A protein has these predicted regions:
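C-terminal structural segments of small proteins and small subunits
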Residues: 115-119
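Short N-terminal helix/helix-N-cap motif within the alpha/beta-hydrolase-1
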Residues: 11-17, 122
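PIN-domain endoribonuclease scaffold, especially VapC-family toxins
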Residues: 2, 20-96, 100-111, 121-125, ...
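Short, hydrophobic beta-strand segments that form beta-sheet elements in well-ordered domains
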Residues: 12, 111-114
Length: 134
């Protein structure tokens, strides 16, 4: 089962074939999201609102559809995830969102699907890069 990073969802939305085709090839019931990913997307929408309100509205519709499509497969930050995040955060400096996604993947035994493999290297989670499947 897979925990999909924000960059894969964003690139699939933009029609990037690597991300789009990978998502289409996987059973939807095997695809999970972190609440952190929802927050990252909302941050982007909020920033976009300042420069392009119409694009922000479109992105917000997309976010709401993601929430509907993955309603039973959105993973929270539980106490177990928080404890795992603390362990991971002590390993090396890193982005808090990535560390929380890694902790979520570790606790729920999911493979992180991301283009940013180096962000998850040596954090104790399996990683899959749809841009480098060969």
């Amino acid at each position: 089962m897979y925990l999909v990073d924000t960059n894969v969802l964003s690139e699939a939305r933009r029609g990037r074939p690597e991300a789009r085709d990978w998502l289409r090839s996987v059973d939807p019931d095997q695809v999970f999201l972190s609440v952190v990913t929802l927050g990252e997307i909302m941050k982007g929408i909020s920033q976009k609102t300042r420069t392009d309100a119409a694009a922000a509205v479109s992105l917000h519709r997309w976010l709401e559809q993601l929430r509907v499509d993955h309603a039973r497969r959105i993973l929270p930050i539980s106490d177990e995830v928080a404890l795992e995040w603390g362990r991971i955060a002590a390993m090396r400096p890193q982005d808090m969102a990535d560390a929380l996604i890694a902790a979520t993947a570790a606790v729920h035994r999911k493979t992180v699907v991301t283009r940013n493999v180096s962000d998850f290297k040596d954090l104790g989670v399996a990683v899959l890069d749809p841009w480098n499947l060969g």
